[in-house]
């Protein structure tokens, strides 16, 4: 992945072909899966990445971040974390800061995943603080947003998604340090996927909110990922949508072959 120094910090570039278009990002979220024995899958993905045009990310458990980072030889694959504390240090038993994650090799951090929002009670206000902490450490940050099935049935998708986006983005967010991931909660791990029209509509709405919050230039450059039961057999159609710039992949990222096949589906979009 190309990079540059901005205020002495690592920042991921998102442009290809002479800075003309958003470059695809395929991010894997391993959740609470993976041990040292799983590093062989990461090695396979690392080797395959040199043949791919997309940027690749694997957010693995904290326990294997360092070991995974040591295995990476490609510049197209980053190892990341799935969460961080909003403070740099202190009396927060069991938590880990962005500074600590960076110290062991994390190059990017996910914040605001629905499993953190709903199972751990994290609010958008807290997500914003976590994103700000990650960005302060010079780590590109994936901010997750998405509605529940109940909210979808009530017709609240746009209201929920836009509110989460507005409240979860720190002032420091821009196209170089922030990636948005739209993950309808009801689609995560269920096999259910919104229609292409629905995905396109929500991503377009997110792009419009980014324009209002960050201005036209940043809104056109910031990547928006789709997440929720993304698999090799549906990825190509999803990636064909104008405002979809990649995917946040769950279970399918645990197996190198599946993850690589998803990334290959983005080739036509990235080339």
Which role fits each region the language model picked out?
Residues 11-271:
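Active-site loop-to-helix "anion-binding N-cap" substructures in soluble metabolic enzymes
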Residues 5-6, 10:
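Cationic, low-complexity basic patches in intrinsically disordered or flexible, solvent-exposed regions
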């Amino acid at each position: 992945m190309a990079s540059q120094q901005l205020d002495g910090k690592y920042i991921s570039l998102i442009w290809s072909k002479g800075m003309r278009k958003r470059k695809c990002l395929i991010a894997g979220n391993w959740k609470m899966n993976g041990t040292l024995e799983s590093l062989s899958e990461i090695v396979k993905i690392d080797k395959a990445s040199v043949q791919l045009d997309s940027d690749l990310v694997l957010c693995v458990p904290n326990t294997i971040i360092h070991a995974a980072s040591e295995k990476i030889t490609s510049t197209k694959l980053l190892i990341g974390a799935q969460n961080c504390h909003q403070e740099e240090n202190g009396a927060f038993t069991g938590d880990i800061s962005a500074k600590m994650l960076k110290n062991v090799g994390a190059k990017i951090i996910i914040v605001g995943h629905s499993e953190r929002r709903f199972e751990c009670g994290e609010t958008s206000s807290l997500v914003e603080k976590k994103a700000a902490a990650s960005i302060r450490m010079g780590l590109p940050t994936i901010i997750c947003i998405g509605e529940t099935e109940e909210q979808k049935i009530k017709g609240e998708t746009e209201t929920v998604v836009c509110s989460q986006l507005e409240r979860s983005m720190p002032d420091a967010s821009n196209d170089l340090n922030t990636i948005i991931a739209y993950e309808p909660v009801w689609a995560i791990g269920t096999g259910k996927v919104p229609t292409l029209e629905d995905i396109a509509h929500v991503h377009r709405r997110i792009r419009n909110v980014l324009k209002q919050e960050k201005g036209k230039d940043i809104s056109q450059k910031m990547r928006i990922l789709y997440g929720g039961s993304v698999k090799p057999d549906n990825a190509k159609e999803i990636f064909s949508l104008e405002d979809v710039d990649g995917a946040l992949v769950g279970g399918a990222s645990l197996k190198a072959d599946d993850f690589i096949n998803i990334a290959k589906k983005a080739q036509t979009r990235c080339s």
